Protein backbone atom coordinates (compact mmCIF):
# COMPACT_ATOMS: atom_id res chain seq x y z
CA UNK A 1 0.00 0.00 0.00
CA UNK A 2 2.78 2.43 0.94
CA UNK A 3 4.52 1.77 -2.37
CA UNK A 4 1.38 2.55 -4.38
CA UNK A 5 0.55 5.66 -2.39
CA UNK A 6 3.98 7.17 -3.06
CA UNK A 7 2.94 7.97 -6.63
CA UNK A 8 0.64 11.03 -6.92
CA UNK A 9 -1.53 9.57 -9.68
CA UNK A 10 -1.98 6.24 -7.89
CA UNK A 11 -2.72 8.12 -4.66
CA UNK A 12 -5.45 10.16 -6.41
CA UNK A 13 -6.95 7.12 -8.13
CA UNK A 14 -7.10 5.16 -4.90
CA UNK A 15 -8.14 7.96 -2.57
CA UNK A 16 -11.53 6.39 -1.87
CA UNK A 17 -10.41 2.77 -2.13
CA UNK A 18 -11.25 0.34 0.64
CA UNK A 19 -8.06 -1.58 1.34
CA UNK A 20 -8.06 -5.29 2.03
CA UNK A 21 -4.95 -6.24 4.02
CA UNK A 22 -2.72 -8.62 2.11
CA UNK A 23 -4.49 -8.02 -1.22
CA UNK A 24 -1.64 -6.14 -2.89
CA UNK A 25 1.04 -8.31 -4.44
CA UNK A 26 4.08 -7.61 -6.57
CA UNK A 27 6.87 -9.64 -8.02
CA UNK A 28 10.40 -8.66 -8.85
CA UNK A 29 12.72 -10.28 -11.34
CA UNK A 30 10.02 -11.61 -13.68
CA UNK A 31 12.19 -11.61 -16.81
CA UNK A 32 14.16 -14.68 -17.70
CA UNK A 33 15.82 -16.17 -20.74
CA UNK A 34 16.77 -19.78 -21.30
CA UNK A 35 20.43 -20.16 -22.12
CA UNK A 36 19.63 -22.63 -24.90
CA UNK A 37 16.49 -22.39 -27.01
CA UNK A 38 17.03 -25.58 -28.99
CA UNK A 39 19.38 -28.53 -28.92
CA UNK A 40 19.67 -32.17 -29.87
CA UNK A 41 16.08 -33.41 -29.84
CA UNK A 42 14.43 -30.47 -28.08
CA UNK A 43 13.19 -26.94 -28.66
CA UNK A 44 11.62 -24.57 -26.16
CA UNK A 45 8.58 -22.63 -27.32
CA UNK A 46 6.75 -19.55 -26.07
CA UNK A 47 7.24 -18.56 -22.45
CA UNK A 48 9.34 -21.68 -21.83
CA UNK A 49 12.03 -19.99 -23.92
CA UNK A 50 11.92 -16.53 -22.33
CA UNK A 51 9.75 -13.92 -20.67
CA UNK A 52 10.37 -10.18 -20.59
CA UNK A 53 7.48 -8.15 -19.30
CA UNK A 54 3.74 -8.39 -18.59
CA UNK A 55 3.02 -4.86 -19.88
CA UNK A 56 4.66 -4.85 -23.31
CA UNK A 57 4.98 -8.59 -23.68
CA UNK A 58 6.53 -9.95 -26.88
CA UNK A 59 5.04 -13.31 -25.93
CA UNK A 60 2.89 -13.84 -29.02
CA UNK A 61 5.73 -12.81 -31.30
CA UNK A 62 7.99 -15.33 -29.61
CA UNK A 63 5.33 -18.04 -29.70
CA UNK A 64 4.99 -17.61 -33.46
CA UNK A 65 8.77 -17.65 -33.96
CA UNK A 66 9.61 -20.50 -31.58
CA UNK A 67 6.81 -22.83 -32.69
CA UNK A 68 7.38 -22.23 -36.39
CA UNK A 69 11.15 -22.63 -36.04
CA UNK A 70 10.76 -25.78 -33.93
CA UNK A 71 8.44 -27.25 -36.56
CA UNK A 72 10.99 -26.44 -39.28
CA UNK A 73 13.72 -28.17 -37.24
CA UNK A 74 11.54 -31.27 -36.83
CA UNK A 75 10.71 -31.37 -40.53
CA UNK A 76 14.39 -30.98 -41.48
CA UNK A 77 15.40 -33.77 -39.08
CA UNK A 78 12.71 -36.06 -40.49
CA UNK A 79 14.05 -35.41 -44.00
CA UNK A 80 17.47 -36.50 -42.75
CA UNK A 81 19.03 -33.04 -43.01
CA UNK A 82 21.69 -31.81 -40.61
CA UNK A 83 19.94 -29.53 -38.15
CA UNK A 84 22.95 -28.44 -36.05
CA UNK A 85 23.59 -25.27 -38.12
CA UNK A 86 19.91 -24.28 -37.87
CA UNK A 87 19.90 -24.98 -34.11
CA UNK A 88 23.02 -22.84 -33.62
CA UNK A 89 21.50 -20.00 -35.67
CA UNK A 90 18.20 -20.30 -33.77
CA UNK A 91 19.98 -20.05 -30.40
CA UNK A 92 22.11 -17.07 -31.46
CA UNK A 93 19.27 -15.20 -33.18
CA UNK A 94 16.83 -15.68 -30.31
CA UNK A 95 19.38 -14.48 -27.77
CA UNK A 96 20.02 -11.37 -29.88
CA UNK A 97 16.24 -10.86 -30.27
CA UNK A 98 15.70 -11.04 -26.49
CA UNK A 99 18.46 -8.52 -25.80
CA UNK A 100 17.20 -6.17 -28.50
CA UNK A 101 13.57 -6.34 -27.34
CA UNK A 102 14.80 -5.26 -23.93
CA UNK A 103 16.98 -2.45 -25.30
CA UNK A 104 14.34 -1.17 -27.72
CA UNK A 105 11.24 -1.29 -25.55
CA UNK A 106 11.87 -1.98 -21.87
CA UNK A 107 15.11 -0.36 -20.80
CA UNK A 108 14.17 2.61 -18.58
CA UNK A 109 10.52 2.51 -19.74
CA UNK A 110 9.20 2.08 -16.20
CA UNK A 111 11.03 5.25 -15.17
CA UNK A 112 8.42 7.32 -16.98
CA UNK A 113 5.29 5.18 -16.72
CA UNK A 114 3.69 7.68 -14.33
CA UNK A 115 4.31 10.57 -16.72
CA UNK A 116 1.19 10.49 -18.93
CA UNK A 117 2.32 12.70 -21.82
CA UNK A 118 5.72 11.07 -22.15
CA UNK A 119 4.34 7.55 -21.77
CA UNK A 120 1.56 8.24 -24.28
CA UNK A 121 4.05 9.49 -26.85
CA UNK A 122 6.37 6.51 -26.31
CA UNK A 123 3.42 4.11 -26.46
CA UNK A 124 2.18 5.55 -29.76
CA UNK A 125 5.67 5.44 -31.25
CA UNK A 126 6.22 1.90 -29.97
CA UNK A 127 2.93 0.68 -31.44
CA UNK A 128 3.52 2.36 -34.80
CA UNK A 129 7.07 1.08 -35.19
CA UNK A 130 6.05 -2.35 -33.90
CA UNK A 131 3.42 -2.71 -36.62
CA UNK A 132 5.68 -1.33 -39.33
CA UNK A 133 8.74 -3.36 -38.40
CA UNK A 134 7.53 -6.46 -36.57
CA UNK A 135 3.89 -7.37 -37.07
CA UNK A 136 3.94 -6.58 -40.79
CA UNK A 137 6.81 -8.95 -41.62
CA UNK A 138 4.76 -12.16 -42.09
CA UNK A 139 2.31 -10.25 -44.30
CA UNK A 140 5.11 -8.76 -46.40
CA UNK A 141 7.44 -11.73 -46.57
CA UNK A 142 5.27 -14.76 -45.85
CA UNK A 143 6.22 -17.75 -43.70
CA UNK A 144 9.96 -17.09 -43.98
CA UNK A 145 9.44 -14.17 -41.59
CA UNK A 146 8.13 -16.56 -38.94
CA UNK A 147 11.48 -18.33 -38.96
CA UNK A 148 13.35 -15.16 -37.94
CA UNK A 149 13.12 -13.67 -34.45
CA UNK A 150 12.26 -9.98 -34.55
CA UNK A 151 14.95 -7.35 -34.09
CA UNK A 152 17.59 -10.02 -34.78
CA UNK A 153 17.53 -10.11 -38.58
CA UNK A 154 17.79 -7.35 -41.22
CA UNK A 155 14.09 -6.74 -42.02
CA UNK A 156 13.25 -5.57 -38.48
CA UNK A 157 16.67 -4.33 -37.36
CA UNK A 158 16.12 -0.67 -38.44
CA UNK A 159 12.99 -0.56 -36.28
CA UNK A 160 14.99 -1.84 -33.31
CA UNK A 161 17.49 1.01 -33.78
CA UNK A 162 14.75 3.64 -34.10
CA UNK A 163 12.88 2.40 -31.03
CA UNK A 164 15.92 2.30 -28.82
CA UNK A 165 16.80 5.92 -29.65
CA UNK A 166 13.88 7.29 -27.62
CA UNK A 167 13.51 4.64 -24.92
Tell what function each PLM region has.
Residues 52-71:
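A conserved FAD-binding loop/helix module that cradles the flavin
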Residues 69-123, 134-135:
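Active-site-proximal substrate-binding core of FAD-dependent oxidoreductases
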Amino acid sequence: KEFLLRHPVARALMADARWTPGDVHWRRHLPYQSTTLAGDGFALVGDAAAFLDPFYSPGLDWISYTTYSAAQLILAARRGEAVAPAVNRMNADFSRSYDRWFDAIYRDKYDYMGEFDLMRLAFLMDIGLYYLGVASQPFRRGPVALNEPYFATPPSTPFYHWMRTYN
